[in-house]
């Protein structure tokens, strides 16, 4: 449902904005908060575009859904790149777009989003700015450092597997309900035609 997706995106965008500015102005951690806020602003603009250009549609097409979920992955990856990469505890949220897709989109689109998410995880593992201070004073053990992306990959695969399983069952039930509704609709039409024919015969 488009409205549900829009609302979830607003929750994410507002959460990002509050977190970035709380870390910068309340905790006084040092990082590029201006660029981080611009990335959040980009996310807000994409959501406004979703509201404006798709206002007459209750459901997004497969293609449109993929583009917006790709934007979500890109936007969050950029934020994580600015704030520590996979060491950032919020990196777990990178899994959400793909999991959301597994419930609502077809297998091909979901696999493509899993690949994009995996590439994003790999990139921000090796290329990123330092985690906002004062945590920069702590030197991470290299085994701990690399265990985080490994855990993310494992979670990505298993969560998507379970989500795909439940999503498939949900789609099967939905198709069955739609077929039942079609049959009932046709029966109503036949009853209506039969009534009209009987009325015509008696007239």
Model-based region annotation:
Residues 56-62, 102-114:
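Membrane-helix interface "capping/anchor" motifs
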Residues 35-40, 141-152:
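Alpha-helical transmembrane segments of polytopic membrane proteins
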Residues 173-203:
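Conserved HAMP-HisKA connector
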Residues 15-20, 68-89, 107-143:
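Hydrophobic transmembrane alpha-helices
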Residues 11-85, 94-97, 117-118:
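Hydrophobic transmembrane alpha-helices and their membrane-interface boundaries in multi-pass
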Residues 1-11:
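N-terminal membrane topogenic signal
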Residues 49-54, 147-184:
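Juxtamembrane or sensor-core-proximal signal-transducing alpha helices
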Residues 91-98, 155:
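Hydrophobic core segments of transmembrane alpha-helices in multi-pass, intramembrane catalytic enzymes
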């Amino acid at each position: 449902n488009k409205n549900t997706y829009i609302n979830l995106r607003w929750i994410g965008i507002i959460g990002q904005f509050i977190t970035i500015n709380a870390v910068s102005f309340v905790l006084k951690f040092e990082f590029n908060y201006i660029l981080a806020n611009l990335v959040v602003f980009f996310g807000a603009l994409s959501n406004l575009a979703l509201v404006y250009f798709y206002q007459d549609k209750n459901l997004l097409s497969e293609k449109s859904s993929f583009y917006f979920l790709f934007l979500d992955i890109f936007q969050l990856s950029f934020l994580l790149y600015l704030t520590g990469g996979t060491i950032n505890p919020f990196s777990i949220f990178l899994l959400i777009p793909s999991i959301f897709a597994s419930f609502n989109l077809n297998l091909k689109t979901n696999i493509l989003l899993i690949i994009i998410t995996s590439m994003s995880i790999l990139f921000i593992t090796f290329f990123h700015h330092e985690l906002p201070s004062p945590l920069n004073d702590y030197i991470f053990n290299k085994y701990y450092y690399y265990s985080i992306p490994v855990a993310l990959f494992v979670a990505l695969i298993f969560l998507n597997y379970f989500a795909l399983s439940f999503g498939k069952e949900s789609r099967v039930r939905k198709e069955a309900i739609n077929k039942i509704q079609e049959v009932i609709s046709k029966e109503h039409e036949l009853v209506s035609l039969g009534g009209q024919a009987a009325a015509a015969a008696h007239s």
